[in-house]
């Protein structure tokens, strides 16, 4: 089994977000990418990426970087995020050294570029994943180690770019299949009542099936709606399904998350 196939085998057989992320981070470091930032939203609109609590955001960037980039809202003007939202595929960061391109940026975009330079985020690649939904979008930022130039990482990409792209695509697709909480964890009972409602059962039916009173079922549905930040139970069923928190096999973890910077995003 080649190292490429072995990595895909490990990724596709991983059972938690944490396992997938740690496997992927370790492999990308082998290619010279020592800082990685992955993001996915199902709530994109024309001028927004949706509520940050609804994103899947994984990063090995420093807390200092994350607190400014997300905490101070720089991501809203980040040129490569804008590129990723409008395109599919791969983009080298070589464009960021083009004087004409830099001259075309807004003041807010130039601030992001200057901040990235100050944090040694200057060489790398962005991969924007294809989506069939106009509201969904995922992308990954692969940042080269500080001692590598864009020429260095372009040489790596010339030799291994196809392999790196496929590994990132598989990582993305695997993450989409795993349960995750995004700061909105449901209790076991909340999942149970949502599952029965999702199966078309009424509150009375659900109460009988679970041996509860209708009032208790209503309470758990209300708490589930509050946790998921939705107005209706139908919305709650949809969002829980988006998070892959519905109909879990016993023993599946919905709480395992990669270690990442805790950032308050305004």
Where on the chain are the PLM-derived regions?
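Helix-turn-helix DNA-binding segment
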Residues: 179-216, 265-266
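Extended hydrophobic
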Residues: 116-145, 150
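Juxtadomain coupling helices with adjacent low-complexity linkers
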Residues: 1-8, 17, 138-187, 195
